[in-house]
Amino acid sequence: MHELVQDIQHSLERVKDPTRVEQMEAYMKNNFSFLGVMSGPRKEIFQKHKAQLLQLKPSASWEFIYECWANQYREVQYIAIDFLLANYKKFAQPSDGTALTFILSNQTWWDSLDLVASHSVGHFATKFPTEFKVLAQEWEESEHFWLHRTLLIHQLKYKQKTNLDLLQYYIRTFKSNKEFFIQKAIGWSLREVSKWKPIWVQKVVLEENLQGLAKREALKYVPEA
């Protein structure tokens, strides 16, 4: 597995653009080190390794993801996310809670969390509802706000299948946290629902007395009365 990750890193290094590093790192608030590889070339590299990666068993899949996550370069971590998005539905297991928690709470920023939350966690929650209920309780009780953001946005892809009662519960639970990424997530989750249930969104905004960023984002697509 180490050789595979090394091979991927070497492939990324061959297409890196050092002139982009400063801009890419600044965009992520200098939280991560970048090689300077844009998404297009990175995805081409992933495609070259995709066939090999898709043959991995569940335990080996997580081993690969963990090794990518331990790499110093963000683009290697992005490859792990590319892999999750492409294949998680095929290797998902009811015991994945610990691994998902690790990915969501380490090397964390919106660029990684939002994709994992809305795709991988969203799938885990529907495929293993009993296990997710236990996991969600742990996340709710955690002091890690990124896990709270995950609970707020994991239903983004559900559309009309969104559990509205559950969404409002999490909004009510976390709305007092003025952290930007929480308020943004509240508004984002409601904005998605407003595309098909705008009156419900208006009701929630009033009932929960949402203000500022959360309110603006929630009502972005809702016609004014």
Regions found by a protein language model. Name each.
Residues 1-225:
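Alpha-helical scaffold domains
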